[in-house]
A protein has these predicted regions:
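Periplasmic-side early beta-strands and strand-to-turn transitions of outer-membrane beta-barrels
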Residues: 164, 176, 185, 192, ...
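Outer-membrane beta-barrel signature, preferentially recognizing the C-terminal barrel domain
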Residues: 282-299, 327, 375-377, 421, ...
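Gram-negative outer-membrane beta-barrel transporters
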Residues: 389-395, 478, 482-486, 504-580
Length: 659
């Protein structure tokens, strides 16, 4: 009965968000707006003028971007809250939370694509710069759990290929974390806790003075310990046995950004600790990552801009018990990007990249310990993208990236599209793009007793067709997208041999479906959002390659009063996962993940000086208090692993000062 009411609520919010287009809301011209009012005005005006930078590497309207995209605004971040980046991304249309048995315990899948045991089909960017993990090929749990979300200005998500401009891993999606810019001086601190042992804290300092901009912040979280029973078949007798386990979920992160007259430096640190379930044995996995980028922009001519970037990232993982692994890998990337504007109708983007990756893995399950990976590889790429406006309402886009990865042959991936605005506020997009994911160091060179790399592997490939129709005005934003992806040369593990061997799958895989999204401001205070994803996937032999529900629906409702009281609720419905059933642990089931965020800004009531303030907030996740078990992706047994403990409640305080 309760599930039916929640499903009905989703439908009502979705229909409201996609059906009502009213008159423009009058804008407040006061220069003395507080932060909340400023955000209201920005987003009411910005729904029809949302600028994005990820699709083309320069600022353009969302309707002009040659990609299918979703944007999480600063206003949405403030209204709905979220302790981690994963919490926020699970609200994005077309994204679904996922998990695996070992290194990547926290992942998101874009439009159902989760064929790997890590997030290697998604490229994460920080202000446009890539953050890759090159040993396994895509671990991102530390970023999703520990990046300081309090510093985010917005998140741009490309749903579909992005390799023409971003290279390897920009396969089924790209997530660009865009941080805030300093204006004057801002100091902000928050702390929260709960009765079950949960705790979180964050701080941020933003300073702009004399052309120098400094943005600094940090975040910490500790989830309640989860005492549960995990059952497995992995033992000599092949009989089910139980393990009492206390599962951890902790993380910390920091970020620093310095900007001075075209010269930029940014760096981040993220660390996370969680559980692993390799061969059915419960253990701990700890990961940490350092990231740094030095960039410089200059104007070579009146219509020619250049950007130079040197990017470094290092990822370290430890599993001190079984599977007794220590990993250490890094990537150095040098990129030169050019933007040439020939006229109002013609624009060219081109650039080149050179990167070097290396990594080691030590297996200490035997004595003496074994060095099972010690690899390195060079890579390079050249990309070009051209856009031409045939008319004011019709634009053509085309591009290609040629790349050379290690000893592999030269290869290329293209993109092309047609963007048409047939009437005011309406836009149509017909896009095709290809992408690739290069084999990781482990996939080509691992010499573990249980798993061996294959030096003959070739990159995974995908080609995606997108057909999108959208409507935007200053109160509403609605889009419907049909997608069809054909993936080839997917890399899997052949577990029929001992040791297991990586290989390229011969049969292609197909993902297709409908992805729809709507956002609507009823008034300045009321905001609704909703989305529906339906996808199916298969290859020649398997009907459900990916452990992601075919049907998912999301809905959020938020009220932000002028007196500083915000109340928001969000429901994430995940349907039944076809083809996956657990034989001994709880089975994966359809569920509603309900969250709420309530904030009381007491500044107006208690402080006359608007430059200082404090607020109380209450945030709750998984309010139905239902434990979530998901398929044990990457294991040979039909089993599940524990992912979400149940209800988590935080009560916290924020204080800030602006100058």
């Amino acid at each position: 009965m309760g599930g039916n009411r929640l499903s009905t609520g989703i439908a009502v919010v979705w229909l409201t968000a996609t059906a009502g287009f009213g008159q423009p809301v009058p804008q407040d011209g006061s220069k003395q707006e507080d932060e909340a009012s400023r955000l209201f005005s920005m987003d009411l005006d910005g729904l029809s003028n949302t600028n994005v930078t990820t699709a083309s590497k320069f600022a353009e309207k969302l309707s002009d971007a040659p990609s299918v995209m979703s944007v999480v605004s600063r206003d949405e971040l403030r209204r709905f809250g979220g302790t981690t980046l994963l919490d926020i991304l699970e609200r994005v249309a077309g994204l679904t939370g996922s998990s695996a048995f070992f290194a990547d315990r926290s992942m998101v899948a874009v439009r159902g694509d989760q064929t790997r045991t890590d997030a290697g089909h998604i490229l994460i960017l920080i202000n446009g710069r890539p953050v890759r993990e090159v040993l396994e090929g895509g671990v991102s749990s530390d970023i999703l759990k520990s990046f300081p979300v309090n510093l985010l200005e917005r998140i741009e998500v490309i749903k579909g290929p992005g390799s023409v401009l971003y290279g390897s891993d920009a396969y089924s999606g790209v997530i660009n974390l865009i941080t805030r810019k300093a204006e004057g001086k801002t100091f902000h601190f928050s702390a929260a806790g709960g009765g079950a042992g949960e705790a979180a804290g964050a701080e941020e300092i933003l300073i702009e003075r004399g052309g120098l901009s400094v943005v600094e912040g940090g975040q910490y979280h500790r989830m309640p310990r989860w005492d549960t029973i995990f059952q497995s078949f992995h033992n000599p007798s092949n009989l089910a046995y139980s393990q009492a386990a206390t599962l951890r979920d902790d993380g910390e992160g920091a970020y620093l950004d310095l900007n001075y007259k075209g010269l930029t430096f940014m760096s981040s640190y993220t660390a996370a600790e969680g559980a692993s379930f390799v061969r059915g044995i419960v253990g701990d996995v700890r990961s940490k990552r350092g990231f740094g980028d030095l960039g410089y922009s200059l104007k070579a001519a009146s219509q020619w801009e250049m950007r130079f970037n040197l990017t470094y990232s290092r990822f370290v993982l430890d599993a001190p018990l079984y599977p007794n692994a220590h990993r250490d890998a890094n990537e150095v990337d040098l990129e030169w990007t050019n933007f040439v504007t020939f006229s109002e109708r013609d624009r060219l983007t081109f650039g080149t990249t050179i990167n070097h990756i290396q990594g080691q893995e030590i297996y200490s399950g035997v004595q003496p310990a074994l060095l099972v990976e010690d690899g390195k590889r060079w890579g390079s790429g050249f990309y070009v993208q051209y856009e031409h406006r045939l008319t004011d309402d019709l634009k053509l886009i085309g591009g290609v990236q040629a790349n050379k990865i290690g000893s592999l042959a030269f290869d290329a991936v293209p993109r092309g599209g047609l963007l048409w605005n047939p009437a005011a506020h309406f836009s149509l997009k017909a896009l095709y793009g290809a992408a690739f994911r290069a084999p990781s160091l482990d996939e080509t060179g691992l010499t573990h007793p249980g798993l061996t790399g294959n030096p003959k592997l070739v990159p995974e490939k995908v080609g995606t067709l997108d057909l999108q129709a959208s409507y935007q005005n200053n109160r509403a934003q609605v889009s419907v997208d049909y997608f069809h992806s054909r993936e080839t040369q997917l890399i899997f593990e052949d577990g029929s041999t001992r040791p297991a061997l990586y290989y390229n799958l011969g049969a292609p895989a197909t993902f297709q479906g409908i992805d729809s999204e709507g956002k609507y401001y009823l008034r300045r205070n009321w905001f609704l959002m909703g989305s529906v994803l339906y996808q199916v996937n298969h290859d020649k032999a398997i009907a459900n390659l990916s452990p992601i529900p075919s049907l998912g629906a999301k809905a959020g409702l938020s009220y932000a009063a002028e007196n500083g009281v915000d109340v928001s609720v969000f429901d994430d419905y995940r349907g039944h996962i076809g083809g996956y059933a657990a034989s001994i642990n709880p089975r994966p089931e359809a569920l509603h993940s309900l969250s709420a965020h309530v904030r009381f800004d007491l500044t107006k009531r208690w402080l006359k000086n608007g430059d200082r303030g404090f607020a109380f907030f209450l945030h709750g996740d998984d309010l139905t208090n239902r434990a979530v078990w998901l398929p044990a992706l990457g294991t040979n047994s039909p089993n599940t692993i524990p992912v979400v403990r149940g209800r988590t409640l935080y009560f916290g305080l924020e204080v800030w000062q602006k100058q």
